Amino acid sequence: MRGYEATPLNQGISNQPRPSSRSKVLDLILAVGAKMAPNDCHKLVNAKFSVVSTRHEYARYSRQLILPEIGTEGQSALQNSSVSVVGCGATGSIVLDLLARTGVGELTVIDRDFVELTNLQRQVLFDEGDLDLPKALVASQKVRRANSDIVVHDIIKDLNLNNAEDILGHSDLIVDGTDNMETRFLVNDVCTKHEIPWVYCGAVGTHGMVMPIIPRATPCLRCFIPNIPPQGVLQTCDVAGVLNTIPPIIASIATTEAIRILLGKQATDTRLIIYDVWEQTLQKMNVVKDSSCRCCVESQFEFLDAKKGDKITTLCGRDAVQITPAREATIKLAELAGSLDRIGRVKHNEYTLLFKDPSTDFEMTLFRDGRAIIKGTRDPEAAKSIYARYVAR
């Protein structure tokens, strides 16, 4: 399927059980946990739910199958959908977990970062045993344990103009779990160009926002925010902080919007949903399509078409700069650790290398693909100098 056209697995099965059969369906729910011949249960389930072939599958999704908003065709559509979650932080990790438990058949999680102690206050998929491991890897392992019937891909990379179309192009829908507007504008370019629906969301302080975006049918992100605001204009997590009760709410709203799109039941109007958990207020704002939008009207994909080169990003919430080489490399972390060990303190695992030079205030985390996060500076030029000094180009 492409985005919001739900197609049932079996066209020969009626959309919903007739009212006269409703009691049989409810009886079936009770029968799942009862002593019942497996063959009889199998036949009864298949008679009513084309998407379910075993008692195990019916037991997993039974509470959704009886919802009129989802039903059998809806569950079939979810199981035949592919969703990518960009960013696996406070909101993205919860979105990923909810989509997995809902039964979305194929999930891809993309995240460039590793688990740090500061994440554990609000990023509920992670615990102390996950420290220093890639977020995408840990998250994919944990949601597979929640639902082993689905396919989950983890991509431990920075999403950028060099790889965004290859990574996201297969998706039926994309959910935003990022922490910066530059990546959101890049996702908006990809989705507009390839007509992929997506859900914009974010949380900071005590409030968060969600907006579903469907190319051609609704305004895009740049109709709402034409340009990336100058640094310091938007609130960020390092300045405003984050109350850990707001990301689960925003993630739940975003996941619900994603499910509605996958089922073809999205609202016809474009709403920006704003929720403040401290004040307990919910607002809905209508977003109007910009008739001169450079992205969705003029098809100028500036964030995809920018000059390709090393990407330098100042990271939200940390005194740090990320460097992503234009050409992906394969760094032999163990060998480099041996060399750097003579200079400073080194820790490494299969995925990352952490280096601290005692003569300076910076700390470098290096990934296998050549990407590095330089802590202790917000100056891109200083970060580039540190990278060039310690990492062979």
Predicted features, each with a name:
Residues 7, 16-18, 37, 324:
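Intrinsic-disorder/low-complexity coil detector
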Residues 11, 16, 26-30:
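Short hydrophobic targeting helices and cationic amphipathic motifs
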Residues 6, 31-33:
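Intrinsically disordered, low-complexity tandem-repeat regions
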